[in-house]
């Protein structure tokens, strides 16, 4: 066994061995199932540090449950990531001077599949480096044939049941990527902007007007109304009156609607088709829809003089025109929220066009009913931490219908067909030669939303599906609760009449050392493969696991990674020490001590095992990590090994340490696999815990360690060498007359581990749990304490003199506050009292 831990040697070929031996792809159907769906990473590129954290948490659970005797299934897969992957592929084609217009959709699809295969292979290599216990025999892809069948089938089901409809509605549109977006694919970004206060003149009046504020004058041509709040008394006299659009000169009427906020600006709002809230008002008031911006972000012919201008260019020209006509009252510099596409980081326009939607109201009710049913925990998802259940609840109460169609070529084609008359048929196969399939594809989250059962080969009604659905837990970050978790939740209830997973562990994000989100723009991203190359996968895993608290972010820290490596190195050194132990005794120690020490460490191990099993159910990994660290550094290394050094306990110490390696395996799979084989010449994943029995009362060891620890702390405090003898006495607190049958054994261990001798008296008292420890003051300490005492006397003399001088000063007494004088007097009294005591 090598003297120094080398992660490159230890981790080499381990994952390949686990796959070859089918440790995680062979299933014992007599055991209780435990299943996890791996959140399918996008095939847009390589895995980042967040993926490493997410998969490490799941790998721990899978390995731990296997250790506990479960039949584990960890379903791997990748996501086709429609918009994101298509953008990457199109960029590659441009770099290769290939124009997508020169390729058919089928050829583009093949190019994307080439991309997918390339990056899926890269992702699998990264999974291997991390040591993930995935069942690769069950690997899936959200755009494979089985997924396509599942997607088509559930789309048809939802349509027939009235949950999917095609409607001409306002949607967010990405003018760069040329596709519609769902409400949660856009973000509000605060930017410097201008607020224009425009004059809307009362019809047939040259003097009376109302002021209406807008940040987007380019939408003026689509104005169809002005509104005030129904309770707005200040502006109520304008209700039903006509006003002149300052740009088009068309007449628009003043209406009332709750959307207008009284006392905000003038309290009057203009209504156009290029705002989601405005569109809702248009529907409520049954008004006309006029669009002035097209899907390319350019102006329509609603006003011919601005046609084909970009919206920003049109804004500049419209403002100039209105200024010339004195129709702008004022312009303010403000910060406003601009709606941006999260996909392309460009402005998302609100356009009205026919799209496919899922009605969210009935599904919101389904989830809310589950959440609010406190008496049926076995039938609802348990969130860790629970606050995310409340966050999901709030979102579901406000959910809009989900726009599921995308104007892309990469994705699941919508199983809808049109004839020449515009009739629609929704079915999985073509109705005939005169029918053309819808050219749009489905939102990526549609296929990943059904993954908990489609990856188990639904719609096949197999034993495989029945056994592993619902999955045991989903592990994901809080930033995709609405994108993914909510959709899996209602899709599972709808299709399977059951929740998709029993528990949801929601973790945070990994931030840099300054607490900033990692991003390409900041250049603060960290490649997990670089960390594995330098420190090893186990060091990275330990850092990620032991810094994990449900719902909270992690701040990346190189010092903590290095601390993880140091801990692993200590485990290596302990294992090497145990392997090199000679069975022949080198030191004769009482057999009673050896047996008690063995029993004591066994109890510590069993308690640790119970804690790990219990805390893993609630995902308290940081708590587990602290207890493991304590067991290694304090219980095993500082106490147990020190006690049994030189005994013939090699067999026991080897077995208890091997048991610990098995228990530690879910945290550090590479290291423990390697060390277990070194000690036992047997594979860890083919082994059970050694049966070890406890025969002694462990209070004896606990009491002795408490005494030794106190003596060691005293040495540290006064910087006393271990060579200097300490002298102590023990007095039982509970019963001073009771004979301590273990006293001689205690004396032996205290002498061995603390170099302290039992004596008849002591000047310093330490109160312990069951004893009063009385310690004689060593001469070295007496000298140091005398030096400290003299320094304190000199300090007190100086302070007393200073305080007396201040209090005898009439100016101080007359000018200082009563509180200040009182404080100084109290200070003097305290100093005099201490001086008399210490002298």
Curated annotation (Swiss-Prot):
Disulfide bonds: none annotated. It holds the Pfam family Anticodon_1. PROSITE patterns: AA_TRNA_LIGASE_I. Residues 315-343, 813-839 form a coiled coil. It catalyses: tRNA(Val) + L-valine + ATP = L-valyl-tRNA(Val) + AMP + diphosphate. A motif ('KMSKS' region) lies at residues 517-521. It comes from the Bacteria. It is an enzyme of class 6 (ligase). GO terms for biological process: valyl-tRNA aminoacylation. GO terms for molecular function: aminoacyl-tRNA deacylase activity; ATP binding; valine-tRNA ligase activity. A motif ('HIGH' region) lies at residues 41-51. SUPFAM superfamilies: Anticodon-binding domain of a subclass of class I aminoacyl-tRNA synthetases (SSF47323), Nucleotidylyl transferase (SSF52374), tRNA-binding arm (SSF46589), ValRS/IleRS/LeuRS editing domain (SSF50677). Its EC number is 6.1.1.9. GO terms for cellular component: cytosol. Its main location: cytoplasm. Monomer. NCBIfam families: PRK05729.1, valS. Catalyzes the attachment of valine to tRNA(Val). As ValRS can inadvertently accommodate and process structurally similar amino acids such as threonine, to avoid such errors, it has a 'posttransfer' editing activity that hydrolyzes mischarged Thr-tRNA(Val) in a tRNA-dependent manner. Belongs to the class-I aminoacyl-tRNA synthetase family. ValS type 1 subfamily. ValRS has two distinct active sites: one for aminoacylation and one for editing. The misactivated threonine is translocated from the active site to the editing site. The C-terminal coiled-coil domain is crucial for aminoacylation activity. This is Valine--tRNA ligase. It comes from Mycoplasma mobile (strain ATCC 43663 / 163K / NCTC 11711) (Mesomycoplasma mobile).
